[in-house]
Amino acid sequence: MKTEIHPDYHTITVVMTDGTEYQTRSTWGKEGDKLNLDIDPKSHPAWTGGTQQVLDRGGRVSRFQKKFSGFLKKD
């Protein structure tokens, strides 16, 4: 393996939506950082069988819906 061409691979802590934590190795962040998940297998509708909810971060979904609200409506 060539030296100095691969990203740093270190241990981080992943925090699930219910607060449980586990450690894994990753190239994300720095050694000891915490990665807080917004959605995970315990809360995602694909794995829980629930209805889908859209997380609107920064109003992007609402801006899209406002912009294209009448796009396919027939008069």
Curated annotation (Swiss-Prot):
UniProt keyword annotation of Ribonucleoprotein present: yes
Record-level Gene Ontology MF annotations: rRNA binding; structural constituent of ribosome
Taxonomy, superkingdom: Bacteria
Keyword hit for rRNA-binding: yes
Keywords for the protein's UniProt record, in alphabetical order: Ribonucleoprotein, Ribosomal protein, RNA-binding, rRNA-binding
GO cellular component: ribonucleoprotein complex; ribosome
Gene Ontology process terms (BP): translation
UniProt record similarity statement: Belongs to the bacterial ribosomal protein bL31 family. Type A subfamily.
Subunit annotation: Part of the 50S ribosomal subunit.
Function per UniProt: Binds the 23S rRNA.
Protein name, as recorded: Large ribosomal subunit protein bL31
